[in-house]
């Protein structure tokens, strides 16, 4: 059947498309007034550029094809963040802070969940050039503002720090393969598995690793972590970052999950996930990723977030698309001026093509432009 789409690929019909576009404009305008400049990376690039500095999961999610011009392997973007990082590092080449935003379709080889689309409409913001925690504070607050403007306010923003995991894994002396296994166990909060894999790890490192899954809650979690962590400059710096975030964002619904390490291959510091709208899955993900720009010849401090606009729109009431005005195809003097005046006021006006009586309501018309006593007026459309 030629009209059947692949699994997890959907059309956006007029009402949904109108809702998505209105949401896109509103959020991009919010970025603009906060100093974030819009960039539009290409849909496909050479594969090594798209996946450089990213984890294995991004490589597996990327569709691949052969470029008929160069013979090189290309990929359809699965995440726009590496592209924006390339633009900052290699094209803009700014010395100071750079704030960039973006919105576009990405394509995934597999859906992220059973109900997810394989063509998310990714929207995000990135802040480059500032290594301090002030940049992370700005980005988390921007995310909260964006969700509020989208009318899906965050009910919870979970914050973690991959620096804690990296420091503990290094102190435990784990080889990369063992570190991967440890990461998987922490993500699953598999305490029996953690006890088994940490046999032989010296104290207090082992105790700290076993405590991580339970370190979830309010700002008090940071002090609990400090009490059980070994002495380390990296651990001390990570906990200081979390304390500053807790103090600066106390008006937001933030919590701390020190075992949440999603994207730890990619991120280098603070990580966060926002929840809301009754969704069990995160609406937005973000964090610091200072090392990714190295692949493009220029390492820059970087932090940001992204979300799927389609998923966000599902949490909103169905959009009410304003009806259009049906105008005569031809009329007396003044018709063209009347139509243009209505369009200038934001109304949709379409011409009544002959031979389609009885179908104009289906086409979206709910009013008509008619001549009454020498003047063009708008009236309800009846029986069309």
From Swiss-Prot:
Record-linked InterPro entries: aa-tRNA-synth_II/BPL/LPL, HisRS-like_core, HisRS/HisZ, HisZ
The keyword Plastid appears for this protein: no
Subcellular location(s) per record: Cytoplasm
Pathway where this protein functions: Amino-acid biosynthesis; L-histidine biosynthesis; L-histidine from 5-phospho-alpha-D-ribose 1-diphosphate: step 1/9
Annotated GO biological process: L-histidine biosynthetic process
Keyword vocabulary terms for this entry: Amino-acid biosynthesis, Cytoplasm, Histidine biosynthesis
Cellular component annotations (GO), alphabetically ordered: cytoplasm
UniProt entry tagged with the keyword DNA repair: no
Predominant location: cytoplasm
Pfam families: tRNA-synt_His
Other noteworthy facts: This function is generally fulfilled by the C-terminal part of HisG, which is missing in some bacteria such as this one.
Role description: Required for the first step of histidine biosynthesis. May allow the feedback regulation of ATP phosphoribosyltransferase activity by histidine.
NCBIfam families given in the database record: hisZ_biosyn_reg, PRK12292.1-1, PRK12421.1
Similarity comment text for this entry: Belongs to the class-II aminoacyl-tRNA synthetase family. HisZ subfamily.
Subunit record text: Heteromultimer composed of HisG and HisZ subunits.
Protein name as catalogued: ATP phosphoribosyltransferase regulatory subunit
Origin species: Azoarcus sp. (strain BH72)
């Amino acid at each position: 059947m030629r009209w059947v789409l692949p699994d997890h690929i959907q059309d956006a019909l007029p009402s949904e498309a109108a809702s998505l576009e209105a949401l896109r404009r509103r959020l991009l305008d919010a970025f603009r007034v906060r100093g974030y400049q819009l960039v539009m990376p290409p849909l496909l690039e050479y594969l090594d550029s798209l996946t450089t500095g990213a984890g294995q999961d991004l490589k597996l999610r990327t569709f691949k094809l052969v470029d008929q011009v160069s013979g090189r392997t290309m990929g359809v973007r699965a995440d726009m963040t590496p592209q924006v990082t390339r633009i900052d590092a290699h094209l803009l080449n700014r010395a100071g802070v750079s704030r960039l935003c973006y919105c576009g379709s990405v394509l995934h080889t597999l859906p992220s969940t059973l109900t997810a689309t394989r063509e998310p409409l990714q929207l995000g913001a990135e802040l480059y050039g500032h290594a301090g925690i002030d940049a992370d504070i700005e980005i988390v607050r921007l995310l909260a503002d964006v969700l509020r403007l989208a009318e899906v306010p965050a009910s919870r923003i979970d914050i973690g720090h991959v620096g804690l995991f990296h420091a503990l894994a290094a102190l435990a002396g784990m080889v990369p393969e063992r570190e991967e296994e440890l990461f998987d166990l922490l993500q699953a909060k598999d305490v029996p598995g953690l006890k088994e894999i940490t046999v032989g790890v010296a104290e207090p490192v082992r105790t700290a690793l076993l405590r991580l899954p339970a370190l979830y809650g309010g700002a008090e979690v940071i002090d609990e972590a400090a009490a059980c962590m070994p002495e380390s400059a990296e651990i001390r710096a990570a906990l200081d970052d979390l304390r500053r975030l807790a103090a600066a964002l106390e008006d937001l619904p933030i919590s701390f999950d020190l075992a949440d390490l999603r994207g730890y291959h990619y991120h280098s510091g603070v990580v966060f996930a926002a929840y809301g709208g009754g969704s069990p899955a995160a609406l937005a993900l973000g964090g610091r990723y200072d090392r990714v720009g190295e692949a493009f010849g220029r390492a820059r401090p970087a932090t940001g977030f992204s979300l799927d606009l389609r998923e966000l729109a599902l949490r909103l009431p169905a959009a009410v698309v304003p009806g259009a005005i049906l105008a005569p195809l031809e009329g007396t003097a003044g018709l063209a001026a009347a139509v243009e005046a209505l369009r200038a006021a934001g109304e949709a006006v379409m011409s009544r093509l002959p031979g389609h009586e009885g179908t104009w309501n289906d086409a979206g018309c709910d009013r008509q432009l008619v001549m009454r006593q020498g003047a063009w007026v708008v009236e309800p459309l009846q029986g069309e």
